Amino acid sequence: MVLGRGSLCLRSLSALGATCARRGLGQALLGLSLCHSDFRKNLTVQQDIMKVELLPALTDNYMYLIIDEDTQEAAIVDPVQPQKVIEAAKKHHVKLTTVLTTHHHWDHAGGNEKLVKLEPGLKVYGGDDRIGALTHKVTHLSTLQVGSLSVKCLSTPCHTSGHICYFVSKPGSSEPSAVFTGDTLFVAGCGKFYEGTADEMYKALLEVLGRLPPDTKVYCGHEYTVNNLKFARHVEPGNAAIQEKLAWAKEKYAIGEPTVPSTLAEEFTYNPFMRVKEKTVQQHAGETDPVTTMRAIRREKDQFKVPRD
């Protein structure tokens, strides 16, 4: 959750949203939360291999329109607000062919069924039978194409048992790729362990995502950056990278701009959940093993009271 305008209301909405997502009660949240995305700006990230349009949704979610400029074909990640997706595709004059769903929680998959009615013939990918309108179930290292772009599916169970991250690259290109991480990896944070263990999150972050090229751009599912960095500062108060990123993120939020994307290389400098091998993080947790450190700091984060500064 982000701090700032209407923060008391947003705390309540975020808590409600998490509950609705776990219980499949997305419609209960719909009327309450659409308004906040109007205060957050869209952003188009021009990568040499693709264009990515960041589409704010609900209180703090992101949807991502991935555009292959060679073919003008596009995919959408987690289209919880279908009408916004349709409008973005029209703006860019692209053909929407593919839905990439990271996990079944309503604030990510809740728009699938409406979108496929608005755009018949869409291919809907995901790793969990609980995902609405699913047409193609994928597993770890499954691959698919969006125009000339290659999409590799990475199984990262923990937040949910069927969570998939999507690594998008262009064959033969030396330019940075992108990974769409849903609720597994956030800027300076990770998702709650609703259906998994610390060992699974360790494998997801360090052994799956952490082994991608360091310059890979990370597009996560929520704008949680300021709060995540305040917890990171609590864990490592002497880490200059955290202090610098927090100051930058506060400035971005103040003007309604996204703090996404980061890169994997950056995450290893300030994300405590990516830094569980570091002595400073282990000492804070009172542990000497990366997995038990992961478990300890996740439990602490779940109870962390975010300072107002």
Swiss-Prot record:
SUPFAM superfamilies: Metallo-hydrolase/oxidoreductase (SSF56281). Coiled coil: none annotated. Gene3D superfamilies: Ribonuclease Z/Hydroxyacylglutathione hydrolase-like. Its cofactor is Zn(2+). Substrate binds at K192, F193, Y194, H222, E223, Y224, R298, R299, E300, K301. Disulfide bonds: none annotated. Keywords: Acetylation, Cytoplasm, Hydrolase, Metal-binding, Mitochondrion, Transit peptide, Zinc. Zn(2+) 2 binds at D107, H108, D183, H222. The modification N6-acetyllysine is found at K90, K117, K230. Pfam families: HAGH_C (PF16123), Lactamase_B (PF00753). Belongs to the metallo-beta-lactamase superfamily. Glyoxalase II family. This is Hydroxyacylglutathione hydrolase, mitochondrial. The lineage of its organism: Eukaryota, Metazoa, Chordata, Craniata, Vertebrata. The gene is Hagh.
